[in-house]
């Protein structure tokens, strides 16, 4: 089905805006995935703050041409599903990775983060990034552990001096 020129321009503009706002992008081939499964994926994506769209490759290349995601141009072949993470860099990668576990025909092609190309086998790097809240809690536990150790050391020194004075 042919798309009118105005519609093509609108699609390119919409995807370009999503790309400029996105923190990372993940590209997949969803050929053979059922409509119901794709609807579920889109619902999960909305909840996770991820923009998901199936776009023609030529339009996608134009949309990401002036963004950090232009490194993905070589993987824009065949049916292309692209996802941009808007709130957390690893959100789209986590979403696609989880979805791929239940779908044999769903294939993650590649990802891009901060202008760097990540092959399909490197998606775990992006998917395992902690969220902001997780990173803060990890940092706080490290600080709390160091503080507790310092307090115990000072208490032991104090007890040692008291024992020596007595």
Curated annotation (Swiss-Prot):
Q: Which UniProt keywords apply?
A: Ribonucleoprotein, Ribosomal protein, RNA-binding, rRNA-binding
Q: Which GO terms describe its biological process?
A: translation
Point out the coiled-coil segments of this chain.
none
Source superkingdom: Bacteria
* One Pfam family cited in the UniProt record for this chain: Ribosomal_L10
Entry-linked InterPro entries = Ribosomal_uL10, Ribosomal_uL10-like_sf, Ribosomal_uL10_bac, Ribosomal_uL10_bac_type, Ribosomal_uL10_CS_bac
A single Gene Ontology CC annotation of this entry is: large ribosomal subunit
The family database entries (Gene3D superfamilies) matched by this protein are listed as: 3.30.70.1730, 6.10.250.2350
One MF annotation (Gene Ontology) recorded for this entry = structural constituent of ribosome
- Subunit (UniProt): Part of the ribosomal stalk of the 50S ribosomal subunit. The N-terminus interacts with L11 and the large rRNA to form the base of the stalk. The C-terminus forms an elongated spine to which L12 dimers bind in a sequential fashion forming a multimeric L10(L12)X complex.
* HAMAP family (UniProt xref): Ribosomal_uL10
- Which PANTHER family does UniProt cross-reference here? 39S RIBOSOMAL PROTEIN L10, MITOCHONDRIAL
Q: What does this protein do?
A: Forms part of the ribosomal stalk, playing a central role in the interaction of the ribosome with GTP-bound translation factors.
Family, similarity comment:
Belongs to the universal ribosomal protein uL10 family.
Spell out the protein name for this chain: Large ribosomal subunit protein uL10
Q: What is the lineage of its organism?
A: Bacteria, Pseudomonadati, Pseudomonadota, Gammaproteobacteria, Pseudomonadales
């Amino acid at each position: 089905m042919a798309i009118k020129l105005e519609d093509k321009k609108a699609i390119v503009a919409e995807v370009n805006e999503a790309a400029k706002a996105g923190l990372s992008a993940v590209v997949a081939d969803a050929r053979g995935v059922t409509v119901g499964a794709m609807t579920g994926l889109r619902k999960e994506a909305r909840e996770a703050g991820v923009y998901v769209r199936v776009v023609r490759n030529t339009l996608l290349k134009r949309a990401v041409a002036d963004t950090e995601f232009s490194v993905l141009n070589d993987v824009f072949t065949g049916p292309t599903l692209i996802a941009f993470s808007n709130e957390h860099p690893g959100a789209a990668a986590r979403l696609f990775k989880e979805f791929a576990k239940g779908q044999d025909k769903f294939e993650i092609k590649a990802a891009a983060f901060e202008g760097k190309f990540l092959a399909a086998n490197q998606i775990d790097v992006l998917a395992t990034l902690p969220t902001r809240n997780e990173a803060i809690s990890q940092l706080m536990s490290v600080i709390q552990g160091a503080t507790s150790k310092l307090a115990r050391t000072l208490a032991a020194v104090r007890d040692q001096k008291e024992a020596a004075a007595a």
